[in-house]
Regions:
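Terminal, charged accessory segments of proteins
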Residues: 1-265, 278-296, 300, 472-630, ...
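Active-site metal-binding core of divalent-cation-utilizing nuclease and nuclease-like domains
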Residues: 21-44, 325-361
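Surface-exposed intrinsically disordered loops and tails
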Residues: 210, 411-427, 461-488
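Nuclease catalytic cores
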Residues: 272-275, 279, 283, 287, ...
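Short, contiguous acidic/charged loop-to-helix segments that flank catalytic cores in large enzymes
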Residues: 306-310, 331-338, 354, 373-385, ...
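Conserved catalytic cores of phosphodiester-cleaving nucleases, focusing on short active-site segments
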Residues: 323, 345-347, 351, 364-376
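Acidic, metal/cofactor-coordinating or nucleic-acid-engaging core segments within structured domains
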Residues: 379-458, 462-463
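Short beta-strand-centered aromatic/proline hotspots
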Residues: 643
Length: 668
C-alpha cells in the first residue's frame, strides 16, 4: 500500500510521480504537487492501492535548515521506528519500503483499520446524500483468481469478504444441503447393538435409536470461521452484512485468539482439504484477513477508486448528521440564507436562561460551523465574522416571521409563517409584553477536529474545549479540563439581551470518534451523543455568561403597569439588560456586566429598579427557579402569595369575621 496525505505539498520525485499519476494532482511552478482527495484508488501500473489520508493527521513543525527556521508538515504524534530523526514527513512513508523503515507496527495497524472507517464513512455519506458531487467512485477491488498483484490492504480484504458473501449464497446452501443429507437416517447395526429394546404386543420398540455417525467436516469449519469474521466486522465497523446460516459462531474470546495468530495456524492445518475454486477462494480471503501480509488475488482489469473531493464537505456532513437538524427540516431562508450564505449546523434546543424545572421549556436556535483543519490550526478573523453574520441573519429572519405587515413578504416566506415548526421560538417577545425590547441569547459554536496521541477511537472525552493560552498557560476549568475559547461580540458591552451581543465558543471533537459513530450508523449511540453534546454546549455557554454577567431576578411591586411605565420612561438605561425568559412572565431577568468600569453604573440602576421591583439580593444561578425567593420578599412586605400545586379555588367572603375564621382553619 502507498500512502499520500491530503493537500500536502510534495516535491515532484520519482516515487511521488508514480503514485499520483492516476489522479491528475494540482501542481505549481516550483514543481510541487498536492492531492485534494481523501480515500483510495488502485493503480494498475503500480499493482497496488494508494491510500490518501486526511490532513487532520498532520501538524506543523518548525525546524532549522542551514540556520534558518522553516515550518514543515509532519505526522502528528508519531516518532520514527529507528534513526536519529525526531519526526516523520509524508514523503518518508509514500512507499512500502519507507513505511517499513519508519512506521511502527502499531501505526501500520492503525492505517489498515482507519482505511475501513474512511470507506464506511464515504459510503454512508454518498447514501445519505445521493446527489452529492463530492464522492467519486468506480468498482472496488474484488478477490478472484485472475491477474495477480501485490495489493493487500485491510480494505481490500474486508471488501472481498463482504462481496464473497453477497455473491455466493448458492454455494453455501448447496454445500450445507449435501453435508446434511442422510444425517437423520437410523444406523440399525449400532442401534441393535447399543440400544435397549422393549417388546410391546409382539413389536420391538427402540426408544433411543442411533443416527448415522457425524464426522468432522472441514467445509463447515471454514464456513464457521468465515461467518465469524463477518459478525466481527458487523459489530466493529457497523457493516450490515447478512449472515443467513445458523451456525454457532466463534465466541468473542475464541475469536480474539484467532486474531492473535491461531486463525492462520488453523487455516494452514486445513488448507489441503479444499478442491473447488470457490472453497479455495474463500480460504484465501479468510487467511488474508488473519495475515494482512498475505498476497491477495484481486481482479485488476480496470482502475478502481473511492475518493472524496473537498473532504471538508464530508466532515461537515458527518458533524451535521451527529448533532444538527437535517437542513430539509429547517425552514427555507433560515439555514440556506438569502444572501447566499449557508449555515453548516443548526438545531433548536433549550434556551440558556430559564427555569430548568419548568415542564414547558422554551427553545432557541443553536448555530454552528465546522472547521476542518490540520491539528493545531487556529481560527482566522474572517471565520468569526462570518459566524456572526449567520447569527444576525437568523435573528432578522425570526423577527420577520412575526411581523404583522406581510405586504412585502414573498409567497415563500408567507408559507414559512404558516407552517414553520420553529415558529414557537421567539428571539424577541411580543411588542406589548417586551417593553424593554430584550432579545434572547443565541449560542454559536465552532467545531474543529483533533486526534488523540494514541489514536484512540472512543475516549472518555470525545469533545472538549479548544485550548487557548492566558499568561503562558492553557486555561482550565474547575475540573482541570480545557475551557473552550469563547468570543463575545457586542456593540454595547453591558447589554447581554441585545441583538448585537453574540456569544461564540470553539470546541474540538475527536475526529476518529466522529468517523466511528458516523460509519456505524447505530441510532441509539448517535442519539445519546447528540443529547450529550447539545447539553454540553448549553452548560458551557451558561458558564461563560455567569463569568461575564451577574444575573438577577426581578418581580414588579404592586401595580405591574407602574413598573412597565418606569421601563418605558427609562428605556435607554435598561435596554439590553432585562428580559422575560421564564414561564411566569411577571418575573424579569436582569443581567449586569461584572466589569469594574460598570460597577457604579450598575449599582445606581439596581437601586433605582429596586423602587419598582423586588430584586434578588445576590445573583442567581442560571437554570434555577427564582420565584420562591421573590415571592418571599413580597410576603415580607405584607402581601401573601401561595403556590398551589393542585389548582386555585376562588370564592366570595361576605365580611371580615368570615375571613378571620377562614384564616384560623389554616386550610387555604
Amino acid at each position: 500500500m502507498r500512502i499520500l496525505f491530503e493537500e500536502h505539498q510534495y516535491n515532484y520525485t520519482k516515487d511521488v510521480g508514480e503514485t499520483i499519476k492516476e489522479i491528475f494532482p494540482l501542481g505549481d511552478v516550483d514543481r510541487k504537487v498536492s492531492v485534494s482527495y481523501v480515500g483510495y484508488f488502485y493503480s494498475p501500473e503500480l499493482k497496488d492501492c494508494v491510500f490518501i489520508l486526511p490532513k487532520v493527521l498532520l501538524c506543523d513543525r518548525t525546524i532549522l535548515i542551514e540556520g534558518h527556521s522553516q515550518t514543515i508538515e509532519v505526522l502528528s504524534d508519531v516518532k520514527p521506528l529507528k534513526g536519529d530523526k525526531e519526526y516523520i514527513t509524508p514523503e518518508d512513508i509514500i512507499t512500502p519500503k519507507g513505511q517499513n523503515a519508519y512506521l511502527t507496527e502499531e501505526y501500520k495497524k492503525f492505517i489498515y483499520e482507519f482505511s475501513v472507517w474512511i470507506y464506511r464513512a464515504l459510503r454512508v455519506f454518498k447514501k445519505t446524500n445521493p446527489g452529492t458531487k463530492a464522492i467519486y467512485e468506480r468498482q472496488l477491488p474484488q478477490s478472484g483468481r485472475g491477474k495477480r498483484h501485490e495489493a493487500n490492504t485491510y480494505l481490500d480484504i474486508v471488501l472481498s469478504l463482504i462481496k464473497f458473501n453477497q455473491e455466493n449464497q448458492d454455494f453455501f446452501l448447496f454445500t450445507i444441503k449435501n453435508l446434511h443429507a442422510g444425517m437423520n437416517k437410523i444406523n440399525w447395526t449400532r442401534t441393535l447393538s447399543k440400544s435397549q429394546c422393549f417388546i410391546q404386543k409382539g413389536t420391538p420398540i427402540y426408544l433411543n435409536p442411533v443416527n448415522k455417525k457425524r464426522i468432522v467436516n472441514f467445509d463447515e469449519e471454514l464456513f464457521v470461521i468465515f461467518f465469524s469474521i463477518l459478525a466481527y466486522l458487523n459489530d466493529k465497523y457497523g457493516f450490515r452484512t447478512p449472515i443467513n446460516f445458523r451456525y454457532e459462531l466463534l465466541s468473542k474470546q475464541r475469536f480474539d485468539q484467532y486474531l492473535k495468530g491461531y486463525g492462520m495456524l488453523r487455516l494452514r492445518q486445513i488448507r489441503y482439504k479444499y478442491f473447488s475454486d470457490r472453497a479455495l477462494r474463500l480460504w484465501d480471503i479468510c487467511f488474508a484477513f488473519f495475515d494482512s501480509a498475505y498476497k491477495l488475488a484481486v481482479n485488476a482489469d480496470q482502475k478502481e477508486f473511492l475518493l472524496a473531493k473537498s473532504f471538508e464537505h464530508v466532515f461537515e456532513g458527518m458533524i451535521d448528521n451527529l448533532i444538527g437538524t437535517p437542513h430539509q427540516q429547517i425552514p427555507k431562508g433560515l439555514a440556506d440564507q438569502k444572501d447566499g450564505k449557508r449555515v453548516d449546523h443548526m438545531y433548536a434546543y433549550d434556551a440558556l436562561i430559564q427555569n430548568d424545572e419548568d415542564t414547558k421549556k422554551e427553545e432557541i436556535y443553536y448555530i454552528g460551523d465546522s472547521k476542518y483543519y490540520k491539528a493545531g490550526n487556529k481560527l482566522d478573523s474572517n471565520s468569526v465574522y462570518k459566524q456572526y453574520t449567520y447569527a444576525r441573519n437568523v435573528i432578522q429572519w425570526n423577527i420577520n416571521l412575526f411581523l404583522n405587515d406581510d405586504k412585502e413578504l414573498t409567497e415563500e416566506v408567507k408559507e414559512d409563517r404558516k407552517n414553520d415548526a420553529f415558529k414557537t421560538i421567539r428571539i424577541r417577545r411580543e411588542e406589548e409584553d417586551n417593553v424593554a425590547e430584550g432579545y434572547n441569547i443565541i449560542p454559536n459554536f465552532f467545531l474543529s477536529a483533533f486526534v488523540y496521541p494514541d489514536r484512540r477511537y472512543v475516549a472518555k472525552e470525545n469533545i472538549k474545549g479548544h485550548p487557548y493560552m492566558e499568561n503562558g498557560e492553557v486555561v482550565l476549568d474547575d475540573k482541570g479540563k480545557t475551557r473552550p475559547k469563547t468570543y463575545i461580540s457586542y456593540q454595547f458591552p453591558n447589554r447581554l439581551f441585545d441583538r448585537d451581543t453574540l456569544i461564540l465558543s470553539h470546541y474540538d471533537v475527536n475526529f476518529l470518534y466522529v468517523l466511528y459513530l458516523y460509519a456505524r450508523q447505530k441510532a441509539g449511540e448517535k442519539a445519546r451523543w447528540k443529547n450529550a453534546v447539545r447539553q454540553k454546549f448549553r452548560d458551557e455557554i451558561r458558564k461563560v455568561v455567569e463569568e461575564k454577567f451577574d444575573i438577577y431576578a426581578m418581580l414588579p411591586h404592586d401595580g405591574e403597569d407602574v413598573a412597565k411605565d418606569y421601563i418605558s420612561q427609562n428605556f435607554q438605561r435598561v435596554l439590553g439588560k432585562i428580559f422575560t425568559p421564564y414561564n411566569n412572565e411577571e418575573i424579569y431577568s436582569l443581567a449586569l456586566s461584572k466589569e469594574e468600569r460598570f460597577r457604579n453604573e450598575n449599582k445606581e440602576l439596581k437601586d433605582e429598579l429596586g423602587k419598582y421591583f423586588y430584586i434578588t439580593d445576590a445573583p442567581i444561578a442560571i437554570g434555577t427557579d427564582p420565584s420562591d425567593v421573590l415571592y418571599a420578599m413580597k410576603n415580607e412586605k405584607g402581601i401573601t402569595h401561595i403556590k398551589h400545586k393542585k389548582g386555585i379555588l376562588i370564592g366570595l367572603v361576605p365580611d371580615d369575621a368570615h375571613w378571620k375564621w377562614i384564616e384560623s382553619q389554616g386550610k387555604y
